[in-house]
Amino acid sequence: MTASSFPAILFLHGFGESREVWTEFTRDFPDGYRLLTLNLLGHGTNVHDIRDYSMEAQARYVAEQLRQRNVERALLVCHSMGGYVALAFAERYPEMVAGLVLFHSTALPDSDEKRANRDKNMDFVRRHGVEKFMESFIRPLFAPSNRERLLEQREFLEDIGRATPQATVLGALEAMKNRPDRTEVLRRAKFPVLFIVGKEDVAVSVESILPQLALPAQSHALLLSDVGHLGYFEEADLTRQAVVDFAGIVFG
């Protein structure tokens, strides 16, 4: 069996991140899977001539990239905004989704409070720049007990964040603010869904996720204490094992 015929797992990063966030996470993955990572539009090295940052445009880009790699179906493992992209992808290309991991992500749209917060963040970026924004944005995404313990990882994310173009930061914030409710995608899902949830997540609360667990036909969940919005660093071994076990279910 050649590597290209192995079951495909596609990892999608979040806002202000890049494909590099998955490097450590995927290093000890078992053989027998084809692991793919992408830079979403405007992120990492994928920064040239981007005009549309919407979740739908990102989903079309993902579909195009999978087709170029001759991937007909994949398990999507998606952090935060990557999950919003994956839900838009699953809405349009359900036949290409073997399974879905919502890694600190949600099918709900922004609340009014969250939308107002996006506007404040955009205003801050326009006035003070991306570098200043990332200095204050990333730290609270870790659970309080992990903020100093995982200093190296925090600085790694801040470096990626600072390198993200201002147009991307503004475009992605606007796109996330305007994304629709996609709970119907979960309700109609013919594929299994794994929710990975941090109990200390300030971006996606446990309370908002619990009702979503009941929506898919087959739902799995990992709820983690002392974890914020960055479980792939905060509980790397546990979350990696959860994804490996889930891949076994999806492709078993």
Where do the model's predicted regions map?
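Short beta-strand/loop motif that positions the catalytic acidic residue
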Residues: 189, 195-197, 201
